[in-house]
Regions:
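Hydrophobic alpha-helical segments within soluble ligand-binding/sensing domains
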Residues: 70-71, 75, 115-130, 226-238, ...
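Hydrophobic alpha-helical
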Residues: 182-216, 228-229
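Short, well-structured alpha-helical segments in soluble
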Residues: 67-81, 180-194
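Glycine/small-residue-rich loop that forms an oxyanion/phosphate-binding "nest" at active or ligand-binding sites
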Residues: 73-120
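Conserved beta-alpha
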Residues: 102-109, 113-170, 261-266
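Periplasmic-binding protein-like
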Residues: 83-89, 135-136, 194-201
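N-terminal glycine-rich anion-binding loop in soluble enzyme alpha/beta folds
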Residues: 2-73, 140-177
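C-terminal functional extensions of proteins
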Residues: 223-267
Length: 267
């Protein structure tokens, strides 16, 4: 064995020295991880994923079932990583299960982490952008769409226009093309009473059309994935200025994902 030898090594601080972010992704989601890879190309930010079992068909009944599996999904993100923030990636799930319940289940496994979900992130984004009257676009059934609209209205964000696709199959949601989404955003957001648009659902591919839609409308556009990425960065202590400086090292331009990325957390 004289040709085999033990070699010396040293350790450094590892990945995620700017921020360690955890993400709980639905089993059926085709989009969230891909869009986060685009939006979190920031030097020193590490993002780790766990998957949670869910039904392909999106109904209030199937959504509420996820709260049983949420602790296991959170547990698969190792506590030893000392996450700064963890996001549960389902807007409709957070609506039906409840934002506080989602946070409680994740915090039971990661008590020192900040927690978010796309619904909570949307509310924070509306506060940061000072949006009070929004148009809402969803792929959901009328029942799930109404539950989300009611939740936003109850939080003080008036939903003045609503459009939905009525798709219960999450696989199909992930295949809705960019032109369909762009045209829907413009049609809803063009109404004068709307000061912005929220596109709900982590499966919808919105990230790469946000900038174009904002230019067309002259109004902010928020998506579930964009809001969640922004909120998790801010909760992790990555300010707008820091994110811009760190992203320049990787050649990324965060402004391409909307005006939201220029905003701090609301007070």
């Amino acid at each position: 064995m004289d040709h085999v030898q033990q070699l010396p090594y040293s350790n450094d601080a590892g990945l995620g020295q700017t921020a360690k972010i955890g993400l709980i992704v639905l089993q059926t989601d085709q989009t969230l991880e891909d869009e986060f890879r685009q939006m979190l190309v920031i030097d020193g930010v590490a993002c780790y994923h766990s998957r949670i079992a869910n039904a392909m068909h999106v109904t209030p009944q199937t959504l509420v079932q996820m709260q049983t599996d949420l602790p296991l999904a959170a547990r698969l993100l190792p506590q030893a990583f000392a996450f700064d923030a963890i996001g549960y990636g389902c807007t409709s799930g957070a609506t039906i299960i409840g934002e506080a319940q989602v946070a409680q289940l994740i915090l039971a496994e990661h008590p020192s982490a900040k927690v978010s979900n796309p619904l909570t992130a949307c509310k924070a984004a509306c506060g940061a952008l000072k949006l009070n009257n929004i148009a809402l676009l969803t792929p959901y059934s009328p029942h799930v769409t109404q539950a989300l609209s009611d939740n936003l209205n109850a939080s003080g964000i008036k939903v003045c226009r609503t459009g939905y696709y009525d798709i219960e199959d999450d696989f199909t949601v992930g295949r809705v093309d960019a032109n369909s989404i762009f045209n829907a955003i413009v049609a809803l957001g063009a109404h004068a009473e709307c000061d912005g648009v929220f596109v709900s659902c982590t499966s919808l591919r919105v990230a790469n059309i946000i900038h174009r839609a904002e230019q067309k409308l002259g109004k902010p556009v928020i998506s579930s994935n964009q809001a969640l990425a922004w909120h998790l960065l801010r909760l992790s202590g990555v300010s707008h200025k820091s994110a811009q400086e760190l992203s320049q090292k990787t050649g990324q331009k965060l402004g391409q994902f909307g005006t939201l990325f220029n905003q701090p957390l609301p007070n």
